[in-house]
């Protein structure tokens, strides 16, 4: 209602003659975004009891709230995007105003950080659920947009394209991340970007 992001969830089994909708999450208790399924386990991104986001699974054969499982728990960093790959769950976080991608193995839920050490913003993640390859865009204060391909199976990353700006070389500039303490002691992340010869 209005700008309220909370939602209910219904599903329909098209394999049966009775095609009536079945309530899975009947209460307005949070935001639930359906990600996909692994058999009878339905996976959701949710902010239910997790303001910064988490991933849960609900078995449609045993959907009571007490049986919900947390697959990826809430962290101190905001979970901003989730994609299902063939063998991994891709989680994009905002950590100190920079993007970070973690991959969780669907079977063991062991996690690994992708081998991409640039600080900045990742966007436009594109993939399919039958592949462990995904694509993304990257930019920061001194780097024009770049597009990468990442293979989660062998951790190989390839630069596919980068925007060329006439008379501009990113290597001529420096961008540093610093942390400034506020009055209450909280460390505030900030960037200082400048030309090398200044």
Give the ranges of each region predicted by the language model.
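Extended hydrophobic/aromatic segments used for targeting, binding, or gating
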Residues: 18-74
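A cross-family structural signal marking well-folded subdomains
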Residues: 88-93, 100-102
């Amino acid at each position: 209602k209005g700008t309220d992001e909370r939602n209910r969830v219904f599903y329909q089994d098209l394999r049966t003659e009775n095609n009536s909708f079945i309530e899975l999450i009947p209460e307005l208790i949070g935001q639930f975004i359906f990600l996909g399924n692994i058999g009878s386990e339905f996976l959701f991104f949710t902010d239910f009891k997790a303001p910064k986001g988490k991933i849960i699974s609900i078995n449609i054969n045993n959907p009571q709230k007490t049986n919900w499982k947390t697959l990826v728990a809430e962290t101190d960093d905001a979970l901003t995007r989730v994609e299902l790959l063939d063998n991994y769950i891709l989680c994009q976080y905002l950590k100190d105003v920079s993007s970070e991608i973690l991959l969780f193995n669907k079977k063991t839920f062991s996690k690994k950080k992708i081998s991409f050490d640039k600080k900045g913003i990742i966007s436009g993640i594109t993939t399919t659920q039958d592949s462990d390859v995904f694509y993304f865009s990257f930019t920061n204060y001194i780097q024009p947009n770049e597009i990468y391909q990442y293979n989660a199976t062998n951790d190989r990353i390839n630069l596919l394209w980068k925007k060329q700006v006439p008379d501009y070389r990113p290597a001529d500039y420096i961008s540093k991340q610093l942390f400034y303490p506020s009055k209450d002691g909280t460390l505030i992340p900030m960037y200082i970007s400048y030309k090398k010869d200044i």
